[in-house]
């Protein structure tokens, strides 16, 4: 090899190495944010500004949202973000008294509402790209434990502005603080799909110790505890699932029906001795999507004393408007009673919405326009969910 060719080869290798370094740096520093920005969108068709009357009423409410996937993304909850739907500054602007933060541990490739297998996962690459601890790269349990740690650390760093909710007493303290005029926001840790148990019953206790106080049994695929509405078999509870269900009720962990198959949901509703929730979704009567609840399922939730959280994205309500959201809420009321209606946004859950958490007064405006009383609006916007939390959470 000639001296000229060796020098050319050396330069080529150095140049290729530089390209790899730059590409790798972009993957780890820019990539995760670009992915989130492309998945958690705000539709440009923003609703009209709420009236002064609606804003004044909204400020008096105890607003509760039962589902946001914010912990999945590489953002500081305490800082205002230029992407996504939820952070503490926007929660405060939206008058949110309590936000349920869910841990998403696995998402299948080609995810859809009809049928997904469990043999692929999009979250693994995301955990690596975000430079999460290596223990999370191959363990669904460790991913959820890491999400719980993120939430706990945010509360510690917030100077009291973000308060972890784990007991009935915590709920009471939050309500008292809000009514005393303190700008404090509650945060309850949930998980979306008990695939993070990794088939081990004892992991319920590990997640409980980390702060889990609500859990959906499935996400987009069948797992070791239950069939998913979007799985292949769509079966009911497994033997492990029944043990887990009973243990959750005994331990004061709220059972979430979201994403469960109709068979699994029916079994859980019949097995329940405490209120159950469907944390986020819609109703088939106003938006005929398979993940949404039938009237009989709404009645089943109501019979347990639970609540149905209505979301704001297209698959939940079919239109990105406050009207569509309140149409679904009013159907829940018609079938299950006023005490069954609640909110469950699915913010930051790879969905497009027309308003983020800072603009929740648009729902209050729509409810007001429909002639609902302040007492009814207070129940829908959060009072019903707080009642369920006080009924189920441990002392």
Regions found by a protein language model. Give the residues of each.
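Active-site core of metal-dependent hydrolases
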Residues: 216-219, 224-295, 309-317
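N-terminal hydrophobic targeting/anchoring segments and the immediately downstream early-domain regions
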Residues: 2-232, 288-343, 347-395
């Amino acid at each position: 090899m000639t001296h000229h060719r060796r020098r050319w080869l050396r330069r080529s290798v150095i140049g290729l190495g530089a390209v790899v370094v730059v590409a790798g740096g972009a993957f780890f520093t820019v990539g995760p944010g670009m992915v989130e920005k492309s998945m958690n969108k705000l539709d440009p068709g923003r609703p009209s500004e709420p009236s002064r009357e609606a804003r004044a009423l909204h400020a008096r409410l105890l607003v509760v949202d039962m589902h946001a996937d914010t912990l999945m993304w590489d953002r500081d909850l305490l800082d205002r973000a230029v992407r996504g739907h939820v952070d503490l500054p926007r929660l405060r602007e939206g008058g949110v008294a309590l936000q349920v933060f869910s841990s998403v541990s696995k998402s299948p490739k080609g995810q859809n509402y009809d049928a997904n297998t469990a043999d692929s996962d999009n979250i693994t690459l995301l955990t690596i790209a975000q430079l999460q601890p290596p223990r999370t790269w191959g363990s669904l349990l460790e991913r959820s434990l890491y999400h719980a740690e993120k939430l706990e650390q945010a509360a510690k760093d917030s100077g009291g502005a973000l308060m972890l909710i784990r007991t009935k007493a915590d709920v009471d303290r939050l309500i008292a603080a809000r009514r005393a005029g303190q700008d404090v926001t509650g945060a309850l840790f949930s998980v979306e799909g008990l695939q993070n148990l990794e088939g081990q019953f004892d992991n319920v206790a590990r997640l409980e110790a980390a702060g889990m106080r609500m859990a959906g049994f499935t996400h987009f695929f069948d797992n070791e505890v239950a069939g998913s509405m979007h799985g292949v078999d769509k079966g009911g509870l497994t033997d492990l699932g029944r043990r887990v269900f009973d243990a959750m009720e005994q331990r004061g962990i709220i059972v979430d029906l979201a994403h469960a198959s109709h068979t699994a949901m029916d079994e859980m509703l019949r097995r329940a001795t405490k209120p159950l929730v469907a944390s986020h979704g819609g109703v088939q009567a106003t938006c005929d999507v398979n993940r949404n609840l039938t009237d009989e399922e709404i009645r089943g939730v109501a019979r347990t004393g639970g609540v149905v959280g209505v979301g704001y994205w297209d698959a939940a309500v079919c239109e990105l408007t406050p009207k569509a959201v309140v149409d679904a809420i009013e159907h829940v009321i018609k079938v299950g009673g006023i005490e069954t209606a609640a909110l469950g946004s699915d913010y930051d859950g790879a969905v497009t919405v027309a308003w983020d958490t800072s603009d929740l007064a648009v729902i209050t405006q729509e409810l007001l326009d429909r002639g609902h009383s302040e007492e009814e609006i207070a129940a829908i916007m959060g009072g019903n969910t707080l009642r369920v939390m006080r009924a189920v959470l441990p002392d």
